[in-house]
């Protein structure tokens, strides 16, 4: 058949616009497209929640793509292998309790798992602010195009209403820090956002799961953002804690949605 460039343009514009409008009112907005939020998105979508991931960059996956220092391999502990199994990610045992997976395959299958389950992805869309209502509860997010943010252009944003937000923005804990900056006397965590501690893989991995919580009304924190929000150590290219944090975040969100 003969291709018509205008039909191609219309197809892309109309279909994306329909999806964008459909997702202006959702159950859970996952800010950041790293491994923790990809895991959470899959489990939430499978449970029937209407969820969307908002990622400022072109690609999802956070820091998982490059493995350790651009060696495309990651390490996962035995207790997190069930999450790898859920996504069909292959791995092998290196030493007892240490399992190695290909980082590129891992990211690809995490993305495929989340989207196949029904999670919608808005890449090149940046988080700019939160929406609040009574008692300063988080009720939505304010978004803009990623290049608008990176180029510091003066362009007003648009808004998304959501029952819950999951901050999966990694080391910067962007959503948490926005709340601290904009809501006087807001209490997040025991000491506020002090940033993560230096490397300690064992403790950082354990606390990544322990720190995954509804840290502020309407806001759940997951992955490396959970460590940054609770003054826990970083852990490097071992990703079991990230995967289990995403699993826990989904469970917390589903329980919370039942009460809203």
UniProtKB/Swiss-Prot annotation:
> Catalyzes what?
hydrogen sulfide + glycine + NAD(+) = ADP-5-ethyl-4-methylthiazole-2-carboxylate + nicotinamide + 3 H2O + H(+)
Its EC number(s): 2.4.2.59
Q: Which Pfam families match?
A: Thi4 (PF01946)
User: Binding residues for Fe cation, per the UniProt record?
Assistant: 156, 171
- What GO molecular function annotations does the UniProt record carry, in alphabetical order? iron ion binding; pentosyltransferase activity
Family matches, as InterPro entries = FAD/NAD-bd_sf, Thi4_fam, Thi4_prok
- State whether keyword Cell inner membrane applies: no
Keywords, comma-separated and alphabetical: Iron, Metal-binding, NAD, Thiamine biosynthesis, Transferase
GO BP terms in the entry? thiamine biosynthetic process; thiamine diphosphate biosynthetic process; thiazole biosynthetic process
Residues binding glycine:
234
What this protein needs as a cofactor is: Fe(2+)
Keyword Transferase annotated: yes
Which principal EC class is assigned to this enzyme? transferase
The role this protein plays is:
Involved in the biosynthesis of the thiazole moiety of thiamine. Catalyzes the conversion of NAD and glycine to adenosine diphosphate 5-(2-hydroxyethyl)-4-methylthiazole-2-carboxylate (ADT), an adenylated thiazole intermediate, using free sulfide as a source of sulfur.
Q: Which NCBIfam families match?
A: sulfide-dependent adenosine diphosphate thiazole synthase (TIGR00292)
User: What HAMAP family does UniProt report for this protein, alphabetically?
Assistant: Thi4
Q: How does it assemble?
A: Homooctamer; tetramer of dimers.
Q: Which family does it belong to?
A: Belongs to the THI4 family.
Q: What is this protein called?
A: Thiamine thiazole synthase
Instruction: Please report the organism this UniProt entry assigns to the protein.
Output: Methanosarcina mazei (strain ATCC BAA-159 / DSM 3647 / Goe1 / Go1 / JCM 11833 / OCM 88)
């Amino acid at each position: 058949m003969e291709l018509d460039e205008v039909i191609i343009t219309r197809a892309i514009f109309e279909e994306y616009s329909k999806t964008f409008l459909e997702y202006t009112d959702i159950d859970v907005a996952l800010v950041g497209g790293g491994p923790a939020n990809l895991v959470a998105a899959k489990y939430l979508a499978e449970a029937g929640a209407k969820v969307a991931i908002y990622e400022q960059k072109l690609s999802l996956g956070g820091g998982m793509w490059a493995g350790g220092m651009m060696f495309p391999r990651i390490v996962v502990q035995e207790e997190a292998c069930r999450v790898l199994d859920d996504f069909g990610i292959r791995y092998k045992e290196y030493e007892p309790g240490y399992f190695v997976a290909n980082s590129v395959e891992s990211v690809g299958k995490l993305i495929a798992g989340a989207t196949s389950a029904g999670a919608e992805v808005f890449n090149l869309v940046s988080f700019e602010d939160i929406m609040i209502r009574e008692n300063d509860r988080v009720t939505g997010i304010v978004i803009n195009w990623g290049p608008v943010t990176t180029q510091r252009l003066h362009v007003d944003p648009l808004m998304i209403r959501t029952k819950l937000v999951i901050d999966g923005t990694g080391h910067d804990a962007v959503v948490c820090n926005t709340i601290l900056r904009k809501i006087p006397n807001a209490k997040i965590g025991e000491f506020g956002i002090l940033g993560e501690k230096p490397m300690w893989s064992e403790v950082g991995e354990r606390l990544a799961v322990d720190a995954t919580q509804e840290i502020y009304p309407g806001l759940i924190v997951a992955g490396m953002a959970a460590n940054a929000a609770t003054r826990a150590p970083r852990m490097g290219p071992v990703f079991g804690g990230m995967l289990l944090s995403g699993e826990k975040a989904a469970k917390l969100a589903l329980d919370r949605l039942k009460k809203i």
